[in-house]
Amino acid sequence: MRTVDITTKIETLREAKAYGRIRLKPETVKLIKENKVPKGNLVEATKLSGIFGAKKTGELLPFCHPIPLDFVALEVKVNEDNLEVFSTVRGIARTGYEMEALTAVTTALLNVYDMCKALDDSMVIEEVKLLEKSGGKSDWFRRLDGVKVNLHAENEGLRKIAEDYLKELGATFAEEAELYISIGDNLPINKEIRSLERVISLYDFRRNPKEVGKEIRVGWSDDALIIILPESEEKIRFFFETFGGIIGNLLCRR
């Protein structure tokens, strides 16, 4: 058993929202609305329990990565015969906040059950579900279906590695192309995309400081996107596994 390896993922702003509902007797709801539950203010305690649950997700679930939480909010809605909980969890991380949002809702509902168990033996937690998530790979990753690529490399082994990644992305190969990738040899770049190059360099350095100096260059030459990769299997795999999905985004924005 093991966790999913997220080493190659990019840290991005991510958000998840979840929902849950517990059914209660109308008499119990009345006590909640009148703030007469013996253990105290149920609504506020439920919000706090949800926040606490979100923070403890990585400890409760063995395969869930512990990730930083930049924002957690719980909304509690008291209805005639049920109580609804909505959670929002946000942060900058390599993986999403779905489990944190779901755990927040679940913990909040369990708190309702705990605070009311002496008052209501008919309670049922009816539903817990993810409402939405954003900021992950699905938001910015674009395949290269229909994109023509000119791939140049003297080293056949390195060429095959890059070719396999490009095929997996859906690219086709041609002499006249909209994307030119060179392994080892420089190609003329009229306008380098400095912001992306800096991000790539930063992530590259964090992965392996000993490889610093073997730069990956990205930019435009006329109407074609140019990518220059060093003759390094590690660098080639790093680029495609971490930033391969951004290539399609660049071409779409051109």
From Swiss-Prot:
SUPFAM superfamilies tied to this protein: Molybdenum cofactor biosynthesis protein C, MoaC
Positions of the UniProt region annotated as Molybdenum cofactor biosynthesis protein C: 1-143
Region Unknown: start-end pairs: 144-254
EC number: 4.6.1.17
Pathway: Cofactor biosynthesis; molybdopterin biosynthesis
Domain of life: Bacteria
Residue positions binding substrate: 63-65, 99-100
GO MF, any single term: cyclic pyranopterin monophosphate synthase activity
Lyase in keyword set: yes
Xref: Pfam families: MoaC (PF01967)
Quaternary context: Homohexamer; trimer of dimers.
Family: In the N-terminal section; belongs to the MoaC family.
Official protein name in the record: Cyclic pyranopterin monophosphate synthase
Organism per entry: Aquifex aeolicus (strain VF5)
Lineage: Bacteria, Pseudomonadati, Aquificota, Aquificia, Aquificales
